[in-house]
């Protein structure tokens, strides 16, 4: 909360996330207070666009799903003057989006940079108060969730990221068994797979509990495959899992992209299969997708807007 991110005093911060989430409470409210910001509360996601025009914020904290929605508005502008588009969507004063809670496609950093908007990615969990790492505007590395905060240190054990420091919880309230599983010798077992490069930048590759173990013993992170396929505009949401011994992808297609490509309902499966085939041609055998399911509704989500896997 006290990390100097070089935000000018009295920056206007529009809070659009649920206040009961640690991410919002820490980074919107406490961070906003510590940096002397003016904190404006968004009263409804349905009125977010109107409130952006009302409050004219400089900074907003979002989850990737929100950023992707705004990215579509920017992409729809085509070759229009970036300054005019930015003024229409955000206002010329807007300069920073802080992103956390899920994977963000790296190419979105380039899209928003075209409009002079920096996306600062971070990583954390409630058990760590919640921020573990963050990106700073003058030190961005695409694909990374930033560098560790000064009060955190990390190690990787069997592919799993473990952290310790002053922000790590003492334990789960009246849950000694769960605490013992998660905290071991002062280290918090995050359950996330990842690595730290030679410059101290943290990269995440998936969740340990989501790993798919193939018949020949290979480990496959479904998030890796999902993130690769989400680069395709026709795929709005995707869930990769093991089903009857093979890797299966369930896809919710993007309706607007279907219209743009002139695809009818009865041709969408064939179009998606072509995308899967294209991915499979480049993927090693153990990471190939052998089954495709198409759904006509969004996946059920958690309160933090992540797809429910189980």
PLM segments and residue spans:
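Residue-level signal for inorganic ion chemistry
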Residues: 60-63, 154, 192, 200, ...
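Conserved C-terminal "lid"/linker of ANL adenylate-forming enzymes
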Residues: 237-240, 244-245, 277-310
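C-terminal boundary motif of the adenylate-forming
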Residues: 193, 231-255
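Gly/Ser/Thr-rich phosphate-binding loop
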Residues: 58-62, 70-140, 236
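Conserved ATP-binding/catalytic segment of the ANL
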Residues: 148-151, 155-214, 219, 231
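Conserved AMP-binding/adenylation subdomain of ANL enzymes
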Residues: 1-12, 19-84
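Adenylate-forming
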Residues: 168, 201-230, 256-266, 283-290
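Conserved ATP-binding loop and adjacent catalytic segment of the adenylate-forming AMP-binding
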Residues: 39-42, 108-158, 167-170, 180-185
């Amino acid at each position: 909360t006290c990390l100097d991110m070089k935000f000018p005093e009295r920056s206007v911060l529009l809070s659009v996330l649920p206040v009961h989430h640690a991410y919002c409470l820490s980074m919107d409210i406490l961070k906003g207070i510590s940096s002397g910001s003016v904190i404006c509360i968004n009263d409804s996601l349905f009125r977010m666009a109107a409130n952006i025009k009302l409050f004219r914020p400089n900074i907003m904290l979002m989850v990737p799903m929100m950023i992707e929605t705004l990215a579509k508005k920017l992409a729809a502008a085509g070759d229009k003057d970036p300054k005019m588009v930015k003024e229409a969507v955000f206002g010329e004063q807007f300069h920073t989006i802080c992103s956390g809670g899920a994977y963000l496609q790296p190419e979105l950093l380039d899209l928003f940079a075209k409009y002079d908007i920096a996306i600062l990615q971070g990583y954390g969990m409630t058990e760590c108060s919640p921020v573990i790492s963050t990106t700073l505007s003058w030190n961005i590395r695409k694909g990374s969730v930033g560098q560790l905060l000064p009060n955190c240190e990390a190690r990787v054990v069997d592919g799993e990221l473990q952290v310790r420091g002053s922000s790590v919880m003492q334990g789960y309230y009246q849950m000694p068994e769960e605490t013992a599983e998660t905290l071991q010798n002062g280290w918090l077992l995050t359950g996330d797979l990842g690595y730290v490069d030679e410059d101290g930048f943290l990269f995440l590759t998936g969740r340990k509990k989501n790993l798919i173990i193939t018949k020949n013993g290979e480990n496959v992170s479904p998030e890796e495959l999902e993130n690769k396929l989400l680069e395709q505009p026709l795929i709005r949401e995707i869930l990769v899992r093991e089903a009857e011994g093979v890797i299966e992808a369930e896809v919710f297609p993007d309706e607007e992209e279907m219209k743009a490509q002139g695809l009818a309902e009865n041709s969408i499966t064939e179009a998606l299969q072509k995308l899967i085939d294209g991915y499979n041609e480049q993927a090693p055998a153990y990471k190939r997708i052998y089954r495709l399911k198409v759904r006509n509704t969004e996946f059920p989500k958690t309160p933090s807007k992540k797809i429910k896997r189980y």
